[in-house]
Design a protein with these regions (language model features):
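Short, solvent-exposed mixed-charge patches
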Residues: 147-148
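Short periplasmic/luminal acceptor-recognition loop of GT-C membrane glycosyltransferases, typified by
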Residues: 48-85, 111-117, 143
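Periplasmic/luminal catalytic loop of GT-C fold multi-pass membrane glycosyltransferases
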Residues: 67, 87-142
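Membrane-proximal, lumen/periplasm-facing interface regions of secretory-pathway glyco-
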Residues: 1-49, 59-61, 68-70, 80, ...
Length: 148
């Protein structure tokens, strides 16, 4: 017995389409809890963030890349493991306010910084000429460069 090609040829394409259709619903989360992401701050300053080059944490960068997929102007996101050791170390040094942090922000043309309020970088930017605090919440702070 040989099954008819006409009767079984539909199964594989239909199964593939169902798998593809179901995976789109799982590709990105539909909500980002305020307890983990600065969603209200980002929503409030959406127009500025969308236009600027943003330095943020890798986790928050992933959220921003979901919110603003084009043009991609975020320094780092959740794929940090793939950016290479040197780049990742540069990111960590900048976030921790180590020597050279200002050079990194200048080299990449960073216009906005969105970081947890307690990071060393946030502490430094609060007193660094050329940076203005836009808004601070209990968990996040947004800075804007005054240098075009």
């Amino acid at each position: 017995y040989q099954p008819s090609l006409e009767r079984t040829s539909w199964f594989l394409p239909v199964a593939a389409m169902l798998l593809l259709f179901c995976s789109f619903g799982l590709a990105y989360p539909t909500d980002f809890p305020e307890s983990l992401y600065p969603t209200s701050l980002v929503t409030h300053h959406s127009a500025d963030i969308e236009r600027g080059r943003v330095f943020t944490t890798d986790g928050w960068g992933h959220y921003l890349s979901f919110r603003y997929p084009e043009p991609y102007r975020i320094y780092i996101d959740g794929r940090a493991d793939f950016f290479g050791e040197r780049f990742t170390q540069e990111y960590l040094d900048t976030l921790n306010g180590k020597p050279g942090w200002q050079d990194t922000l200048q080299r990449y043309g960073v216009e906005m910084v969105l970081v947890p309020a307690e990071t060393p970088l946030a502490t430094l930017l609060r007193s660094t000429p050329g940076w203005r605090m836009v808004e601070e919440t209990s968990s996040a702070v947004l800075f804007s460069s005054l240098v075009p």
